[in-house]
């Protein structure tokens, strides 16, 4: 049986074009940190904007989402463009990644706090986590209405205490709310080398 959440995302993706899917800003801005090869995972991938960037940079990429519609469209897009993406319908909350399985993990606009330890341990030594999601401090109504799906100030840092911090950005409500990064937090962290 299809859940309400799955139905919501299936409807959204049914009308969408995967060619228009773009990578999240934190991944684009810090793509220079990516390794030249290795295994990557795009969590809650949607139409695969992050997965496409990762695969295009030479990483063997897996993309997981609970929407069969989104995954079908991503598979078709990857095949048409010769991208090494293995797109799978998978509920990452029930089936988290295996420990030490990935060199890169990207999460954008998805928040399941209980999954944070599994994401950190799924990184290989020296592996990178790129994370971008909504914050409770917001200047407009973009993002989810439920505060459970938004981060408290500095919470993203607290969710990944064992990673080496390479980049972090969260501007909250400081300064001119019409400028800068608003409504979101970004993190790039690395699992320490063995």
Predicted feature locations:
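A short acidic, Gly/Pro-enriched loop at the edge of an enzyme's catalytic core
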Residues: 95-104
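A short, conserved alpha-helix within the catalytic core of class I
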Residues: 111-121
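Conserved SAM-binding loop of SAM-dependent methyltransferases across substrates and taxa
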Residues: 47-59
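Conserved class I S-adenosyl-L-methionine
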Residues: 1-35, 37-46
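Conserved SAM/SAH-binding beta-strand->alpha-helix loop
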Residues: 67-69
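Conserved beta-strand signature within the Rossmann-like core of class I S-adenosyl-L-methionine
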Residues: 127-134
């Amino acid at each position: 049986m299809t859940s309400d959440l799955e139905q919501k995302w299936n409807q959204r993706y049914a009308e969408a074009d995967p060619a228009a899917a773009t990578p999240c800003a934190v991944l684009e801005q810090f793509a220079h940190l990516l390794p030249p090869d290795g295994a990557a995972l795009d969590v809650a991938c949607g139409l695969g904007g992050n997965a496409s960037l990762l695969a295009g940079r030479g990483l063997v990429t897996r993309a997981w989402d609970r929407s069969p519609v989104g995954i079908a469209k991503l598979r078709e897009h990857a095949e048409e463009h010769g991208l090494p993406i293995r797109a799978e319908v998978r509920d990452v909350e029930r089936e988290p990644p295996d420990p030490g399985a990935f060199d890169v993990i990207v999460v954008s606009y998805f928040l399941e706090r209980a999954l944070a330890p599994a994401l950190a341990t799924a990184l290989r030594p020296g592996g990178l986590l790129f994370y971008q999601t909504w914050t409770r401090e917001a200047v407009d109504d973009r993002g989810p209405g439920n505060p459970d799906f938004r981060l408290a100030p500095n919470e993203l840092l607290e969710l990944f205490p064992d990673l080496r911090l390479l980049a972090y950005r969260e501007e909250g409500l400081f300064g001119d709310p019409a400028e800068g990064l608003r409504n979101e937090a970004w993190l790039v962290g690395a699992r320490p080398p063995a």
